[in-house]
Amino acid sequence: MADITLAQLLEAGVHFGHKAYRWNPKMFPYIYTERNNIHILDLVQSAQLLKEANSYLQSAAEKGQTFLFIGTKPQASALIAQEAKRCNSYYVNHRWLGGMLTNWVTLKSRIARLKTLEQEEADQVFNLLPKKEASLRRKELEKLRKNLNGIKDMEKLPDVAIVIDQKREMTAVIECRKLGIPIISILDTNCDPDLVDIPIPGNDDAVGSIKLVLQSLTDSINTGKLTTK
């Protein structure tokens, strides 16, 4: 796909960081200036690192690697599911449950439970149960779907993680690092670039910014899948 231009990044508001007092000094190399107490990110670096991330993802997809999209904040939730589905990947967009990756064996048992309940629902088993029991199972199914629907077909740990809002998803970031899973993440001015493998300096709050970057990353995965080795 064509590289994202500086004009596109600018229009999407990718350059807007947080208020200066909220910054992480480790982000200093990626900050262009400060304006009205708001840090402005260097879009030249954002474009270069987005290109690097895209190249990495395309290559990983060519090798048949798997991807997990992580983003639970309201601005990102729907986009995370949409883009992950568009490249046939996995996602967590409601709530990160501690141990989702590091306690994979336990998580697999919860996924098995989800699939059992879904089968019971499809077979209309709930209609044969006492009202109270049926209600409890429906509530359990709804909760499991919310938390696990995006990873219910994930049979092994993902090869690459794509994260929106490092601060919010720190538990997921720590689990990925513990397991050696490479992380690509949009990093706002309050983030820590040392905790990711490929940082993409950018606004992780604005929907337009999140959408532009996620779509670009997804396009690269799809390009790679077309030429799977």
Curated annotation (Swiss-Prot):
Superkingdom classification of source: Eukaryota
Compartment(s) of residence: Plastid, Chloroplast
Output the Gene Ontology terms for molecular function. structural constituent of ribosome
Q: What is this protein called?
A: Small ribosomal subunit protein uS2c
Span-the-membrane segments of this chain are: none
Presence of the UniProt keyword Transferase in the record: no
A GO biological process of this protein is:
translation
* Family as reported in the entry's similarity comment: Belongs to the universal ribosomal protein uS2 family.
**What's one GO-annotated cellular component?**
mitochondrial small ribosomal subunit
Keywords, comma-separated and alphabetical = Chloroplast, Plastid, Ribonucleoprotein, Ribosomal protein
Subcellular location, principal: plastid
Q: What is the lineage of its organism?
A: Eukaryota, Sar, Stramenopiles, Ochrophyta, Bacillariophyta
Q: Which SUPFAM superfamilies match?
A: Ribosomal protein S2
Q: Which NCBIfam families match?
A: rpsB_bact (TIGR01011)
